[in-house]
Amino acid sequence: MPKKALDSRIPTLIKNGCQEKQRSFFVVVGDRARDQVVNLHWLLSQSKVAARPNVLWMYKKDLLGFTSHRKKRENKIKKEIKRGIRDPNSEDPFELFCSITNIRYCYYKESEKILGQTYGMLVLQDFEALTPNLLARTIETVEGGGIVVLLLHKLNSLKQLYTMSMDIHSRYRTEAHSDVTARFNERFILSLGNCENCLVIDDELNVLPISGGKNVKALPPTLEEDNSTQNSIKELQESLGEDHPAGALVGVTKTLDQARAVLTFVESIVEKSLKGTVSLTAGRGRGKSAALGLAIAAAIAHGYSNIFITSPSPENLKTLFEFIFKGFDALNYEEHVDYDIIQSTNPAYHNAIVRVNIFRDHRQTIQYISPEDSNVLGQAELVVIDEAAAIPLPLVRKLIGPYLVFMASTINGYEGTGRSLSLKLLQQLREQSRIYSGSGNNKSDSQSHISGRTLKEISLDEPIRYAMGDRIELWLNKLLCLDAASYVSRMATQGFPHPSECSLYRVSRDTLFSYHPISEAFLQRMMSLYVASHYKNSPNDLQLMSDAPAHQLFVLLPPVDLKNPKLPDPICVIQLALEGSISRESIMNSLSRGQRAGGDLIPWLISQQFQDENFAALGGARIVRIAVSPEHVKMGYGTRAMQLLHEYFEGKFISASEEFKAVKHSLKRIGDEEIENTALQTEKIHVRDAKTMPPLLLKLSELQPEPLHYVGVSYGLTPSLQKFWKREGYCPLYLRQTANDLTGEHTCVMLRVLEGRDSEWLGAFAQNFYRRFLSLLGYQFREFAAITALSVLDACNNGTKYVVNSTSKLTNEEINNVFESYDLKRLESYSNNLLDYHVIVDLLPKLAHLYFSGKFPDSVKLSPVQQSVLLALGLQYKTIDTLEKEFNLPSNQLLAMLVKLSKKIMKCIDEIETKDIEEELGSNKKTESSNSKLPEFTPLQQSLEEELQEGADEAMLALREKQRELINAIDLEKYAIRGNEEDWKAAENQIQKTNGKGARVVSIKGEKRKNNSLDASDKKTKEKPSSKKKFRK
């Protein structure tokens, strides 16, 4: 192969980087780009005085025509020699390079293993597998003076990357939205022209016109190095004097920031407080791990025995252990004499150090543990957490306990900005630290690991891995918007407008990611809101915003001042994804198999949870993010933005006139003809003309909204977020039973039906979710705060209002089915303060379920606190001791609330029973009145005595009539006295003669009766011979 003169700009850029301790970036295009890695590495070796640079080679699945296995390479060479296709006396430069160079091969999917490590050269292949996250994670492992090499396959034009399908695009496609536009790739290629330390070259090392460093010139040699930093450190070291071990360890540091950080660590070590936390936050390459290593060496010198270190992987601790041993060297410790090093036997850890045993004065141990092994920290005195932002937040919480804790976190790098640590955990630690310092040691707080801890915060600004102002770092931060957190709104000084004066605009993504200077400034402001208001941020979010076809961006802006040409600062940013409109065939196929396709989170999730085949066919929008800057929080801007968004999708911005025509904005895409007619060596790539791009901000009144049925949101459940979405009219339909691994929060899905759409389905789903949530409160949701659980139940009313409440009220029959008579007696006695709380604990689940199921009438009204107590005790099965801590109230007050609510419920049950008896008695009277209406109430017309006398008279009259009937029924003829007038006169004369003396008995002659119908008794009477009757006067 003939030799060719090398373009002088390539070695010049590498030499300048080594001289300024800055990194260089090379993009190599062509099928033989792999072979140029050897030449670039050789140029780097010639420019650096240090040892041969080590290499990190990142790839997706297969290396570019070679293997990383040394024996396989040797066998391949032997086979080729044996077959006669290779000269045994010649060596391939690339194979020689692979043999003598220290190369670490790593899959992209295992890139977390390289955290905390430093390399002289980075090679990135398989461009289609790259993501913003991988770019930030890998490029920042390269030291100052090193080079980054990106290998691209053969291209006719770099604009082919504008339409290249990336691996991550498969996640963005949905059934209704499958056309992905690679806007991020276009912005990435255009940004290379603004990177002064970047050269884009072909596989013959020809510099292409797009290169940002094409005008590079050699720097004049520097005779003297800048030792101002070392002089400052030396002065600090001298000021410490004989202070052991701080003085010796400060001498190992590289920057003044790092030296001060080590001193802060030493101060906490000397205090030997079991409730201290020291947090170290910095960007990548600032020396966090080195400072932690020196701090551990200081802890050993101060007699700490049990020290535990944790990080995502033991391979991330290479730098940390390296500086532990440098600290030992500064303290005159010798290996094998004073300490031993134990390496891991796990092949996946590549012989990483996992334990150090120190036995100089007494037994001391430095032990690596996995982040999940917080249960082994019982005897810990110091726990060190490196790369804390890369560890799930729940695990970090568990690692904090009654011992000294050091933690380091990257706030500007692949983790996005480490916001989960800074916004969640550190904020809680700050608040607890203020409480602890202000009110002393609170007894209740001391029972929690996190409560009552003191917090010291350290930040490192000056980089160590590379020089301050490294151009690759500046380019990467601008490309991925990693330094957006430093942006400050102008409204902080100009005042805030009223929310009603603000307007919502849709952002054109084609213009936003066009790399135009105005668009870039607006993008940085939007990302600053994301970073400042959200704790889950990743560089991949940027590519999701730009490339996902179903996503849309909206911004809330203050009133526009026409005299001011500058774009106003966005107050609120909304990112949403259009979902749904899935074919019935796909729905049935997925439900029958129990699987779901990618994307369309809410349609698939709700269809699966409720086994409904119609919901996924509805069109909807999911709020991916709503970000408001911290200075605008709780001022009504988020509510205003959501109000305008709802109105937009409800069609309230569209004019009712027939003349309305929606404005359609489109951007011309790169065609095949344009690519074929260009040459790579002469191609000039620049930002699109502003006249060909659509407006950055689109008025909602000029756009045709998509036909949607609902707007939904999926978020990690927190009290503040749940309160916001409930206030916006959203109804919960799904709550994940397992907490998220990264944040420890339960995912919640809430929906709101747009005005004018069918809403019965939402009411049915809400009722079903309400019942399921009640049943699950005693299981996975037991750890919820009672107030949060109550708020979730209350939010269901936003959906159940669309259906008629079919819940029947409690009846006496149901009461008898649920409670026995003994249960009601116990409850009544407890409500009268005659029994202890434990006697009725078994009744609380029944009472709570009846109350929250809506069985009790509306007259039973419990205060929110009483409802929380009933829910916590009856549905979550919590104890009074637990509630005492949760509500921050003494137990006697909680029990008093329980007694009050018991009285209200018992009173209601008594009323139901009384009403049931009254209805039973009233039914008899109703039957007697033959279904007539009951007469109106009239007062009594007489007194009680008169009423009694009247009743007695009626009774006597009835008695007489009955007696008369009986008398009339007797035959008296047989007792009649017979005789004529002569006989009676004779009798009277006889009486008169006696004149009252002697017997007054007279006799009258009778007649015999003739009656053929006489009975047998009368016949016997007739047979008697007596014919006279006697009577006494």
UniProtKB/Swiss-Prot annotation:
Residues 988-1033 are annotated as: Disordered. Pfam families: GNAT_acetyltr_2 (PF13718), NAT10_TcmA_helicase (PF05127), TmcA_N (PF08351), tRNA_bind_2 (PF13725). One of its GO terms (molecular function) is ATP binding. Residues 1005-1026 have a biased composition (Basic and acidic residues). It catalyses: a cytidine in 18S rRNA + acetyl-CoA + ATP + H2O = an N(4)-acetylcytidine in 18S rRNA + ADP + phosphate + CoA + H(+); a cytidine in tRNA + acetyl-CoA + ATP + H2O = an N(4)-acetylcytidine in tRNA + ADP + phosphate + CoA + H(+). InterPro entries: GNAT_dom, NAT10, NAT10/TcmA_helicase, P-loop_NTPase, TmcA/NAT10/Kre33, TmcA_N, tRNA_bind_dom. It is an enzyme of class 2 (transferase). GO terms for biological process: rRNA acetylation involved in maturation of SSU-rRNA; tRNA acetylation; tRNA wobble cytosine modification. Keywords: Acyltransferase, ATP-binding, Nucleotide-binding, Nucleus, rRNA processing, Transferase, tRNA processing. It is found in: Nucleus, Nucleolus. One of its GO terms (cellular component) is 90S preribosome. Residues 560-694 form the N-acetyltransferase domain. Acetyl-CoA binds at I626, A627, V628, V633, K634, M635, G636, Y637, G638, T639, R727. Belongs to the RNA cytidine acetyltransferase family. NAT10 subfamily. This is RNA cytidine acetyltransferase.
